[in-house]
Amino acid sequence: MSEFRQATDAFASNPAESKQEIRNYTMNFGPQHPAAHGVLRLILEMDGETVVRADPHIGLLHRGTEKLAESKPFNQSVPYMDRLDYVSMMCNEHAYVRAIESLMGIEAPERAQYIRTMFDEITRIKNHLMWVGSNALDLGAMAVMLYAFREREELMDVYEAVSGARMHAAYYRPGGVYRDLPDRMPRYKESRWHKGGALKKLNAAREGSMLDFLEDFTNTFPLRVDEYETLLTDNRIWKQRTVDVGIISPDLARAWGMTGPMLRGSGIEWDLRKKQPYAKYDAVDFDIPVGTNGDCYDRYLVRVAEMRESNRIIKQCVKWLKANPGPVMVTNFKVAPPSREGMKDDMEALIHHFKLFSEGYCVPAGETYSAVEAPKGEFGCYLMSDGANKPFRVHLRAPGFAHLSSMDAVVRGYLLADVVAMIGTYDLVFGEVDR
């Protein structure tokens, strides 16, 4: 015992020898991590639990979309747009077809413009439902995902009814949309999960047309949003995880080129639907929700309020579309395919259809930039034509790319657990980030 005490006293008498070197360590967050929301690889330099530096690594989902679009006729690249932000499909299509229409000097019929406006907002609600469910799940609130996917499934049925696909719709076309809205909705069939009174209740809103179904949806959806807010907005744990976490000042948001809820959450009222109206946004009434503190909680409140505003817009579009039937595609036969009925009787129509979908059409030489207010921010398409049937250059402006670039500036000084909350409010989808 005396030997141990002598050694201890000797060690304590020489502080230089007892001083240990404390160094930061590096941690790989993702790409195989459920909170990475895809294939994000975030290399974190940590001082204990505190983030000192964050280095995002991207490219793991790069598919060369821009080059693929340059190798095909203009009208054959619409499906590629669906696969960029694969949670906000039709908004991506909208930017691309608007760019083609701008170069060709054509404008979609009024009914098609209202349909596009309506489906842009359906897409916004779908995106935000996915976001609120997955973000809550990241922070431990599991029930919200089940509630959100209940409504999202109904909107997926709307996608399927109008295009035949639940996700990659390819519904928007240069000059209009693929077809008019259907007169009936898909109905649930009897199974071991759905039978009897429960089956009748599920199909009650599906007896009429799609517009009838959407009218019923818009009447009930505000109550559903109230349910999400009951679970989260005043939840003590939710507020502890999001209030004053990931604060982005207005100057920082502008400096990094942020758009959408990320920008509006910092208190900047910028929305392309109001500032640079397209489609029929100048004919509908809606407000722009903005935050005050620029933290994760404000970005949550902005997105929840946006769902309510999107519901208002859909309701107005449904009312107009019910009262105003009409064409949904231009009559310019260089762009619009002939009817299926016409192809059965007319050889010229059949030849025209074949050439349109095999060779496409030549677009006048020029360049344009078209942007839409996608759910995640400004999604833009720069398109250059040299007069051929294929684009000379396609460049896509993805909001998530600009947002992810700011990750290092935003997360410094926060705890590792807060990084999960911040990644969630960034609402990243790597289909558009990596392109």
UniProtKB/Swiss-Prot annotation:
| A single GO cellular-component term on record | plasma membrane
Q: Which reaction does it catalyse?
A: a quinone + NADH + 5 H(+)(in) = a quinol + NAD(+) + 4 H(+)(out)
Membrane topology field: Peripheral membrane protein
Give the Enzyme Commission number.
7.1.1.-
Which Gene Ontology molecular function entries are recorded, alphabetically? NAD binding; NADH:ubiquinone reductase (non-electrogenic) activity; quinone binding
| InterPro entries linked to this entry | NADH_Q_OxRdtase_suD (IPR001135), NADH_UbQ_OxRdtase_49kDa_CS (IPR014029), NDH1_su_D/H (IPR022885), NiFe-Hase_large (IPR029014)
Q: Which UniProt keywords apply?
A: Cell inner membrane, Cell membrane, Membrane, NAD, Quinone, Translocase, Transport, Ubiquinone
Is Lipoprotein among this UniProt entry's keywords?
no
Q: Where in the cell is it found?
A: Cell inner membrane
Briefly, what is this protein's role? NDH-1 shuttles electrons from NADH, via FMN and iron-sulfur (Fe-S) centers, to quinones in the respiratory chain. The immediate electron acceptor for the enzyme in this species is believed to be ubiquinone. Couples the redox reaction to proton translocation (for every two electrons transferred, four hydrogen ions are translocated across the cytoplasmic membrane), and thus conserves the redox energy in a proton gradient.
**The protein's assembly and partners:** NDH-1 is composed of 14 different subunits. Subunits NuoB, C, D, E, F, and G constitute the peripheral sector of the complex.
Q: Which NCBIfam families match?
A: NuoD (TIGR01962), PRK06075.1 (NF004739)
Name recorded for this polypeptide: NADH-quinone oxidoreductase subunit D
To which species is this protein native? Xanthomonas oryzae pv. oryzae (strain KACC10331 / KXO85)
Q: Which gene encodes it?
A: nuoD
